[in-house]
Each structure stands twice: as C-alpha cells, then as structure tokens.
Amino acid sequence: MENRIQTDRIGAAFDKILQEFPERRRELHERVGRAVQRELQQQIASSGINDSSGKVRRWQVVHIGSGGGYAAVRPEKGTTGADSPGAITNYLEGGHRIASPRGGKNYRPRLRVSYVSGYHFYVNTSMRAESIAIGEAEAWADEIARELEASL
C-alpha cells in the first residue's frame, strides 16, 4: 500500500511537470538566449570595434520562437537599408568593400585598401554557444530534479 501511494505521488509530480513543459521549455530558451547575448556583447567589446557608446551591443537582441522552441540573438528589427542595424552589424561581422574614388584628377584617397576585414564576433560567439546552452540546460534540469524531490 505504501508503494502505491508513493508511486501515485511520483506520477502526479511527473504529470505536473509535463503540463508545465511548454512554458518551461520557453523559459530555458530565454535563459540560453540571454546567456548567448551576454557572450556576444563581450565578443563585440573585445573585438576592437570603436563602440564606446555601446550602440552596436544594444542592437543585438534575443528573439524567442513563437512556440518557445528556439532562441536567436540577432540585430534588432527596425528600418531597412544600408544604414539599418542589421546591415551595419553584417558589415562589421563580415567586412565590406571600400568604394573606389570617383574624384577629380588630383584626388588622392587616404586609404589604399579595397576591403575592410570583419570582426567576426558572431562566429566567435557561435563557437561558445553550444557549451553555454549545455550549461544552461544542465542547470535547468537540476532545478526540475530539485522540484521533483521536494514534491515527494
């Protein structure tokens, strides 16, 4: 009889967790997204970009899927075009071409390069993203395990 009561309690605890799972999964992805966003902001700060105002770092926002099944860090939505946050982030990430001079016959360009190298802060962040996600998932699983133990 004692075993049956304990089994019923375990079953009820599991049922409660399964009912809360979609919300908990969204919570996990929000945690992972915030952690990856912090890592990306550190990569931007250490990349050498002159971002003393923090504008480029502020542009990077966490997006959670509508069903809560994924998290992405990307430039904020807004205006489109060559001077939008997404375009500027892309130029900084991957580099960009410098337009050739179109001046008069005596014009001498200050720069003598045809391409500006990128800072690759998204690439550097993606190398650490998996370990960040694993760490957050382990902490999330530990919280669920503690809740299960407490309910028994």
Where is each model-derived feature located?
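Short, Lys/Arg-rich flexible segments
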Residues: M1-R74, R102-L152
